[in-house]
Structure formats: structure tokens, C-alpha cells
A protein has these predicted regions:
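Acidic, Ser/Thr-rich low-complexity segments on the non-lumenal side of membrane proteins
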Residues: 51-66, 262-315, 319-323, 328
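Membrane-embedded alpha-helical bundles of multi-pass integral membrane proteins
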Residues: 1-280
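Ferredoxin-type iron-sulfur electron-transfer modules in oxidoreductases and energy-metabolism complexes
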Residues: 282-311, 327-433
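Short acidic (Asp/Glu) and glycine-rich catalytic loops that position anionic groups and cofactors
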Residues: 25-30, 223-226, 316-322, 379-383, ...
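Flexible gly/pro/ser-rich segments immediately N-terminal to CXXCH heme-c attachment motifs
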Residues: 112, 146-147, 210-220, 303-315, ...
Length: 444
């Protein structure tokens, strides 16, 4: 075992350890939410996950962005096959260890990876152009200023460098093999789809020492970019690469638009309607140290854990905001910003608890310090955001819980809704006329 193998093993251990620590922090943040059971109908959940998360079925609702994303997605998935060999070579000191064993299938796999890498490169440039040159409107909203905009570009730059490293590694190795200097077994061309051309026409004619250097630069560059990419993900919206699968699996299976009832309210209503219930019975005393349950949500700790997982899964693609009628008509509401705010607040509370303990209290809350009442009441409850999300995120659940808190805990409600509620109570309709006049329209 040489020094390069030791360096690789240390890099491997350090990279995965750092990644695991950060993922554990995020899982802890998600667990700040209240408990909710999303384990029913596992078969349907698994099929939905395969169709939506793995099959990318909702991405192609917008064909251009959808197809470009699928190019990058397929390249990412298939490249992991080659990464297994790279890890094996790095640990053992071998060179293309699987080539002799797999034979022609190895050539097919590497060729497929190279073709997909070219398509991913095309998609990368297209996405950079859409964000920075064409300035697609949904990427220019106020919540995308600063870090979110930079984050979207950084990952695309990393994608470009990673693909260049792959082609440098394979192209230089092809040129070495053509002159009988490659460390890989056998001789002659690898017959890879792209790098065989590069090896002959781009790297051909270079001296052997330069080719060996370029091959090693490509190999180590590939490794460094993989670990850099992996450990950048916990700080990036691109963490959806991993969270999309559990997020879709645990998504709400109820029909879109069906709102959940609050258990505490349902319990009270059932008790009121029970003819055998004692109307003078005192409420059950709370356990010692327990806090009365809130109506709705004021902070992320009042949401359920799935809402917070939704926030960490958010791709910031803006399809929700782009389809939101409130946002389209100039209202302050942006469903994407709602999810970003939930994630930021969960991070803030999680970091505070890790530093100061469970009694951490910064005097802030999700409602008020991150999301304003104006945003909450701008929502029309149309579910356009839920319908458009490619990974089944549900901003409406969060908005509804924030509204419930405002109405039921703080008695804050727009005057228009006060009038409507009064009319419903008195007239059994939102409009201010007597129920006896309902059929007068037929006489007009």
C-alpha cells in the first residue's frame, strides 16, 4: 500500500464522516417537528416514490427544464457505478480493476457514462444560461437574491469541473494505452464512446510523463470533486438528491385539497355532540410540566416533522411560486419562500439547541420574524403550489396551520373574513341576505 492509497483512505473516511455528522444534524432538525404517522399503505407509497422520485414523472410538466434535469439526473445515477471502481482502485492501488472481469460490458458502461456526461454538460450550460443570461423570471424573485442564487450556480460549476475531470482521466488513459503505457490490463484502444476520440485527437502526441500527470490530475480531481460535492450538499438546496425519496414516500396520500382536522378540536366537537357526555365535566388535567396544546403553528416546533422535511427537500425551482395566483397578481406570498423560511428557522433553532441546550430561546418565531401575516392571508388555498411541486412538497399545510394560530390563538383575522364568518353563522351563507330570500332570483 503506497502513500497515495493512505491519502485516499483518509480522504474517504474524513469525507463520509463529515457528511454523516451534517446529515445527523439535519435529521435532528427535522425531529423538532411534532409526531405524525405516515406509514399507512406502504405499497402505494413505494409505487409513488418509484414513479415520482426515481422516475421523475412530474419534472416533464415543463418539458425543457424537465428533460435537461433528467440528463443531469441520469448522469449522476449511472456515474455511481464507475465511482465504485474508483473507490476500489483508490483503496487497493489497482487501475481499472473491473475492466478485465467485465470485458465488453465494462466498455458499454463507461461509454454510457461518457455519453450521459456530455448530455449533463449540455444541460449544465443550459441551466447556467437560464439562470444568468435568459434570467427566467422565477429565478429572479426577491427570495432568490444572495446565497440562493449563488448556490444554484456553484453546483453547476462543480458539475462542469467533475465532467472535465472524467474526460481528462479517460482521455489521457486512452492515449497512454495506445502507446502501451497505460496501467490498465491489455493493450489497444479502450473503445470508449467519447474518450477514445479524445485520446487520439486531443491527448495524442503528448509525451508519456505529461499523459501520466494528466491522468492522475483527472483521477484525483474526480475524487476531490465527488467528496466536495457530497459535503457541500448539506449546506445546499441540492440536498433534494437524497431527501426527495423519503419525502415522496411519506407524502400525504389524501386527495389534494383535503385539509387535516386538528385533533384537539375534533375531540371537543365529538364531546359536544355526544348525548351521553356530561356538559359540566371538568377538562382532564394536564400531566405535570405539560404545556397546553397550541391551535395551529407559530414556530417550526408546532409543525409536524413532515413539514420540516418538506422544507429540506425544497429544490427552490420556483414552480410553486410561478403558478401561485396570489404571487402572479402581485401579492407578497411566495410558496417557495415559505419553504425556505421554514428550513432557515429549523436550522436556527437546531444550531441554538446544539450550542445552548434544550432551553434555547431566541425570542423569535416563524410567524412574524420570517413569515408575515400578509403572506399567510394572501393564499387562496387553490393548491397550485402542491400540484406543481415535482417532489410532492405541500406549502399549503404550513400556511393553514399559521392561519389557524392567528385566528384561534390570537384572534387575528382580516375584517373581510369577519364579515363572511358572521354571515355564515347568521345566514348559513357568506353573503349578507336573509335565507328566506334565496329563491328570489327565479323571479327576476
Amino acid at each position: 500500500m503506497g502513500i497515495s492509497n493512505i491519502i485516499f483512505i483518509l480522504l474517504l473516511i474524513g469525507g463520509f464522516t463529515f457528511f454523516a455528522v451534517n446529515i445527523k444534524k439535519i435529521i435532528t432538525n427535522i425531529k423538532l417537528g411534532k409526531s405524525i404517522d405516515r406509514t399507512d399503505d406502504k405499497g402505494k407509497r413505494f409505487k409513488t416514490m418509484m414513479r415520482v422520485a426515481l422516475g421523475q414523472s412530474k419534472m416533464t410538466r415543463r418539458p425543457i427544464a424537465g428533460v435537461l434535469h433528467i440528463f443531469i439526473y441520469l448522469a449522476f445515477v449511472i456515474t455511481q457505478i464507475e465511482l465504485i471502481e474508483v473507490f476500489f482502485d483508490g483503496i487497493t492501488g489497482s487501475h481499472r480493476a473491473f475492466m478485465e472481469f467485465l470485458g465488453g460490458f465494462y466498455t458499454f458502461i463507461i461509454s454510457l457514462i461518457e455519453v450521459l456526461s456530455v448530455l449533463a454538460l449540455v444541460a449544465t450550460f443550459a441551466f447556467l444560461a437560464r439562470r444568468n443570461l435568459l434570467k427566467i423570471p422565477r429565478f429572479q424573485k426577491s427570495e432568490m437574491n444572495g446565497w440562493p442564487k449563488l448556490d444554484g450556480n456553484i453546483i453547476l460549476y462543480m458539475e462542469f469541473v467533475l465532467v472535465m475531470c472524467i474526460f481528462t482521466m479517460n482521455g489521457a488513459d486512452e492515449a497512454l494505452r495506445l502507446v502501451g503505457e497505460s496501467h490498465a490490463a491489455g493493450g489497444g484502444s479502450f473503445d470508449f464512446a467519447i474518450s477514445s476520440f479524445l485520446g487520439e485527437h486531443i491527448f495524442g502526441g503528448m509525451d508519456v510523463s505529461t499523459l501520466h500527470l494528466l491522468e492522475r490530475i483527472g483521477w484525483w480531481g474526480h475524487i476531490f470533486m465527488v467528496f466536495a460535492f457530497m459535503n457541500y450538499l448539506p449546506y445546499s438546496k441540492h440536498l433534494h438528491i437524497f431527501w426527495a425519496f423519503p419525502n415522496v414516500f411519506f407524502a400525504n396520500l389524501n386527495p389534494v385539497g383535503k385539509l387535516t382536522n386538528m385533533e384537539s378540536v375534533t375531540k371537543e366537537v365529538k364531546m359536544m355532540l355526544d348525548p351521553n357526555a356530561d356538559p359540566y365535566a371538568a377538562p382532564e388535567p394536564l400531566p405535570e410540566g405539560a404545556v397546553p396544546e397550541k391551535f395551529g403553528a407559530k414556530d417550526v416546533t408546532d409543525l409536524h416533522w413532515m413539514n420540516i422535511m418538506n422544507a429540506y427537500t425544497c429544490t427552490e425551482c420556483g414552480r410553486c411560486t410561478d403558478s401561485c395566483p396570489a404571487n402572479i397578481t402581485g401579492k407578497k406570498l411566495s410558496p417557495r419562500k415559505i419553504m425556505m423560511d421554514v428550513r432557515d428557522r429549523a436550522e436556527e433553532i437546531g444550531n441554538g439547541i446544539r450550542k445552548e441546550g434544550k432551553d434555547f430561546n431566541d425570542g423569535k418565531s416563524l410567524l412574524g420574524d420570517y413569515i408575515t401575516e400578509e403572506e399567510v392571508w394572501a393564499c387562496t388555498s387553490c393548491n397550485a403550489c402542491v400540484q406543481e411541486c415535482p417532489v410532492l412538497i405541500n406549502p399549503l399545510e404550513i400556511i393553514m396551520d399559521l392561519r389557524r394560530y392567528l385566528v384561534m390563538e390570537e384572534s387575528k383575522i382580516p375584517s373581510e373574513l369577519v364579515t363572511m364568518n358572521t354571515n355564515i353563522e347568521n345566514n348559513q351563507a357568506p353573503w349578507q341576505f336573509s335565507p328566506t330570500d334565496r329563491l328570489k332570483w327565479k323571479d327576476e
